[in-house]
Regions:
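Accessible peptide chain termini
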Residues: 1-2, 270-273
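Outer-membrane beta-barrel domain signature, strongest for Gram-negative TonB-dependent receptors
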Residues: 1-114
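Structural signature of Gram-negative outer-membrane beta-barrels, strongest in the C-terminal barrel
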Residues: 22-33, 50, 88-100, 104-163, ...
Length: 273
């Protein structure tokens, strides 16, 4: 239960906001992994399989805004404006698979390069759905004035033609589905020469697909997103030891930031972000 009181500087009115809600969260994350040595001190394979689930529920959020009636002398002098009821449920699923291979070469006592390669796959999906209900206090059988306790306002016996009218304000934009898929492969080499030269080079390829189905903020225009990209990310890291205290290093790498599901939704809802 949250109660706020302050000034709306746009309308120059004293306002109150009453909010009652319950939230439920469920989270699971699990992994299975293994390491297999094919030849001792020469090559090995490791792998990991993972799954994660997360959900967030608001089964009944009640919100009441009230405004100070400056012409009313008796208490309470705040009248109810724009009560609403809100329900939402969000579910996320994620599955991943990774495998890596390592092979060691022995060319000489000072030069023993190591070759690495691997693949990675990830799939994520999200479903979000919400419902909104507004309350019209147009009847004559309910007092619009109350002092913080608005629990009675939402009672079933107050919903009638002569008291409070209840209307659904849910639109198509109050729900969406989204998913993404990532497939990656890499190869890298560690080329160290004694204690003088340390060099690591590699390249990673990523295929990424992001899908989203929803509606524009007004709920009238369907929005379908299907973005596909293929990127290459080279990396180089070379260090040359001039002495035990001094070295020269050169490095280069490339990366990318990808949007979260909520960042591609074509409308803004502060309630579920």
């Amino acid at each position: 239960l949250t109660q706020r009181e302050g000034m709306n500087y746009y309308s120059d009115k004293d306002i109150r906001k009453w909010e009652s809600l319950y939230t439920g969260r469920t989270t699971y994350s699990g992994q299975i992994s293994g390491v297999h040595t094919l030849r001792e001190n020469v090559n090995k394979v490791d792998w990991t399989v993972g799954y994660a689930f997360a959900s967030y529920r608001e089964p009944d959020r009640k919100i009441v805004n009230s405004i100070l009636d400056e012409n009313r002398t008796e208490q309470p002098n705040y009248y109810v404006s724009d009560p609403m009821r809100y329900y939402q449920e969000l579910k996320d699923h994620s599955a991943s698979l990774a495998a890596n291979y390592e092979h060691k070469f022995t060319v000489s006592d000072r030069f023993a390069p190591v070759l690495n390669g691997g693949v990675y796959g990830e799939y994520k999906s999200r479903t979000f759905a919400a419902r909104r209900f507004g309350y019209n206090l147009l009847g004559s059988g309910y007092d619009r004035y109350a002092d913080w306790d608005y629990t009675e306002l939402f009672a079933d016996e107050n919903i009638s033609a002569d008291k409070i009218w209840m209307r659904e304000t849910t639109t198509n934009s109050d729900s969406y589905t989204s998913e993404n898929m990532l497939g990656a492969a890499y190869v890298s080499a560690k080329l160290n020469y004694g204690e003088v030269l340390n060099a690591n080079i590699g390249v990673r390829m990523e295929y990424y697909q992001l899908k989203m189905d929803g509606y524009s903020s007004d709920g009238t225009t369907p929005v379908h997103l299907d973005n596909k990209t293929t990127d290459f990310f080279p990396s180089v890291n070379v260090a040359y030891n001039l002495s035990q205290k001094h070295l020269v290093r050169a490095a280069y790498g490339r990366s990318v930031n990808r949007p979260e599901f909520r960042e591609v939704v074509p409308y803004l809802s502060l309630i579920h972000i």
